[in-house]
C-alpha cells in the first residue's frame, strides 16, 4: 500500500531535551571503535579547546529517540517497518557536540518519492540547544520496499 503523502512537511519536536553525557559519548566511541582521546579523555578535550568531551560526528543518531513522535512512527503514514531498509544518513555539524549539551530535536518528513516499486522517505533533522543555538542538521533516507503506487 502506498505511503500517505499528506505527511510530507509534517514536523515533530522533542518535548524533553536530549542530555549529552560523558559516559554516553565514551560508550558510543567504544561501540564504533574510535580511540580518539577527544571522545574519551576530558583533559585531552579541554587541552584541545573544548568545554568537555567531544561526541563523534555520528553520535547524533543516538539523539533521535523512537519516542520523539517522528512522522515515520505515526501509523497513519502507512509505513511497515518490516519492509524498510536504511538508505542513507548525513549530518552537518555547525559546532562540535560536547558533554553537557542539552539538545532539542526537530524532525520533518521532507519527501516521499517513488523509485521503481519502492518509496524513499527523507526525514530532515535540526539539533538545537535549549537556548536555540543550531548545533547540527541531518537527513535520513529510508526505503520502503514494494509500496510504491502502481504506474
Swiss-Prot record:
Out of the domains of life, which is the source? Bacteria
Q: Which residues form the MaoC-like domain?
A: 8-127
Molecular function (GO) terms listed?
(3R)-hydroxyacyl-[acyl-carrier-protein] dehydratase activity
One Pfam family in the UniProt entry: FAS1_DH_region
List the cysteine pairs that form cystine: none
Alphabetical list of InterPro entries matching this protein = FAS1-like_DH_region (IPR039569), HadA-like (IPR016709), HotDog_dom_sf (IPR029069), UPF0336/Enoyl-CoA_hydratase (IPR050965)
The biological process GO terms on file are: fatty acid biosynthetic process
Q: Give the record's family classification.
A: Belongs to the UPF0336 family.
Recorded protein name is: UPF0336 protein Franean1_6066
Amino acid at each position: 500500500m502506498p505511503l500517505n503523502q499528506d505527511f510530507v512537511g509534517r514536523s515533530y519536536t522533542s518535548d524533553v531535551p536530549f542530555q549529552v553525557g560523558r559516559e554516553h559519548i565514551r560508550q558510543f566511541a567504544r561501540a564504533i571503535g574510535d580511540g580518539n582521546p577527544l571522545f574519551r579523555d576530558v583533559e585531552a578535550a579541554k587541552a584541545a579547546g573544548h568545554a568537555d568531551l567531544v561526541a563523534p560526528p555520528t553520535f547524533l543518531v543516538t539523539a533521535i529517540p523512537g519516542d520523539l513522535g517522528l512522522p515515520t512512527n505515526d501509523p497513519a503514514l502507512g509505513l511497515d517497518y518490516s519492509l524498510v531498509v536504511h538508505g542513507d544518513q548525513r549530518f552537518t555539524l555547525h559546532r562540535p557536540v560536547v558533554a553537557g549539551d542539552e539538545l532539542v530535536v526537530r524532525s520533518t518528513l521532507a519527501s516521499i518519492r517513488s523509485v521503481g516499486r519502492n518509496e524513499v522517505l527523507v526525514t530532515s533533522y535540526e539539533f538545537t540547544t535549549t537556548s536555540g543555538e543550531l548545533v547540527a542538521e541531518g537527513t535520513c533516507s529510508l526505503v520502503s520496499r514494494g509500496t510504491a503506487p502502481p504506474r
